[in-house]
């Protein structure tokens, strides 16, 4: 029969030994906890650094459009997207327009919804992926805005806002500086002189010069854009074919000519002149005001009412001491400087009218109605232009309606500089 294994008696420890073991375990536990605490502290510090350096700055809101908020990460991503598709521009240049583009994309989205025109994120994502393009919130919004713009023009404006046909007029037109010149040119037109030649000789508006006076057959909205003046069009759409207008006064359109009246009162040094001056709309007006000044009329009152050069007007005609400019530069214009620094200019005397090319407001139109068509079909180019104009009007109206909801105030110059630098770095890293 097998012997029973003798059970060992548990080892007994003295009170002193037990106290020692307990202290040892406590030390081990403290060391362990301390180690864990150090690790946790390191993780917290690293995480806090990441939070402060990356997460928090990237996730702060920089632009608001109503309830829609756009953070710095979105701003940077949008800047990168536009930078990659507009390689001819630096990120600094694109950043000038970026806040408005972000707002515009959101307004297009909001404005399209009441028209029943929407595109889901999923559809945009699929479109981007099929084109091997990266997908992000920014790229989705950019692509959506582009697609919505096309659909709004095709499905809304092109159908409901812009007709297929409209009244159209073909006009020849030019603006001259004064009523007397207009009367002279009108006689030449009636006598059969070539209109294009007359434009080259007499026209003072940039629009007539650009098109040689021939604005073609178009609806009014197109001609409004080409002429940038209502006076000639009011006449043309109410006149018969073949009509030549009388001189039509226009006090708002600008022309590329004006006339100086200058009085050099003193020369403090060889390179300085003390000057009084007015810049006036026409030669006739300049002659009249010169006579009034020489008769003792008040310079301040005349400059305030008639001068069309801002420095002259703001200083009430007293332009003060002007220093001769360095070579290849001017203080005002070549014509102005040439007179005031000419040693032969007589002091204290008003000059004759000196023509110059600074723009002035006001002139007289002559219009010849070449052709008129009632409710004629629009050309494809005109209709496309009209659709784009109406779309621009629609977008401007959205800005007006939502002006109080648009907030750029959080997008500081420091944030923009930081965003540009970060975007440049990320683009460089991606390219490397």
Residue ranges and their predicted role:
Residues 50-142:
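N-terminal targeting/tethering segments
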Residues 75, 195-196, 299-300:
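Conserved hydrophobic/aromatic "anchor" residues
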Residues 132-138, 196, 205-213, 309-316:
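Secretory-pathway/luminal and periplasmic proteins that interact with or process carbohydrate-rich
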Residues 213-227, 232, 317-325:
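N-terminal entry motif of extracellular EGF-like repeats
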Residues 5-36, 44-58, 83, 95, ...:
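PPIase-associated folding chaperone regions across multiple families
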């Amino acid at each position: 029969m097998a012997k029973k294994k003798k059970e060992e008696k548990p080892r007994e420890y003295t009170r002193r030994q037990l106290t020692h073991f307990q202290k040892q375990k406590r030390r081990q536990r403290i060391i362990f906890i301390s180690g864990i605490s150090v690790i946790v502290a390191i993780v917290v510090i690293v995480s806090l650094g990441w939070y402060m350096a990356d997460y928090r700055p990237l996730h702060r809101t920089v632009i608001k459009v109503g309830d829609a908020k756009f953070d710095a990460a979105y701003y940077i991503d949008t800047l990168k997207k536009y930078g990659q598709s507009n390689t001819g521009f630096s990120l600094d240049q694109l950043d000038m327009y970026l806040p408005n583009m972000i707002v515009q994309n959101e307004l297009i989205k909001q404005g399209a919804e009441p028209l029943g025109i929407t595109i889901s994120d999923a559809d945009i994502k699929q479109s981007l992926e099929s084109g091997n393009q990266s997908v992000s919130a920014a790229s989705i919004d950019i692509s959506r805005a582009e697609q919505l713009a096309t659909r709004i023009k095709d499905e809304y404006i092109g159908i409901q806002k812009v007709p297929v046909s409209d009244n159209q007029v073909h006009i020849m037109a030019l603006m001259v500086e004064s009523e007397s010149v207009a009367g002279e040119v009108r006689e030449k037109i009636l006598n059969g002189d070539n209109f294009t030649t007359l434009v080259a000789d007499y026209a003072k508006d940039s629009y007539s010069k650009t098109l040689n006076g021939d604005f073609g057959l178009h609806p009014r909205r197109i001609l409004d854009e080409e002429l940038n003046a209502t006076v000639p069009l009011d006449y043309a759409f109410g006149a018969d074919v073949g009509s030549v207008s009388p001189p039509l006064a226009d006090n708002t359109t600008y022309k590329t000519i004006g006339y100086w009246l200058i009085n050099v009162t003193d020369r403090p040094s060889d390179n300085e002149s003390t000057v009084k001056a007015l810049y006036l709309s026409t030669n006739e007006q300049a002659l009249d005001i010169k006579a009034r000044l020489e008769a003792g009329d008040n310079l301040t009152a005349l400059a305030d009412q008639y001068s069309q050069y801002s420095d002259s007007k703001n200083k009430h005609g007293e332009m003060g001491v002007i220093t001769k400019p360095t070579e290849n530069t001017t203080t005002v214009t070549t014509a102005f400087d040439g007179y005031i620094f000419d040693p032969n200019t007589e002091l204290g005397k008003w000059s004759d009218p000196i023509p110059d090319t600074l723009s002035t407001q006001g002139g007289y139109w002559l219009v010849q109605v070449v052709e008129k068509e009632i409710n004629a079909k629009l050309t494809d180019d005109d209709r496309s232009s009209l659709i784009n104009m109406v779309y621009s009007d629609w977008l401007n109206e959205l800005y007006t309606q939502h002006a109080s909801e648009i907030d750029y105030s959080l997008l500081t110059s420091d944030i923009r500089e930081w965003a540009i630098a970060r975007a440049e770095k990320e683009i460089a890293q991606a390219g490397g």
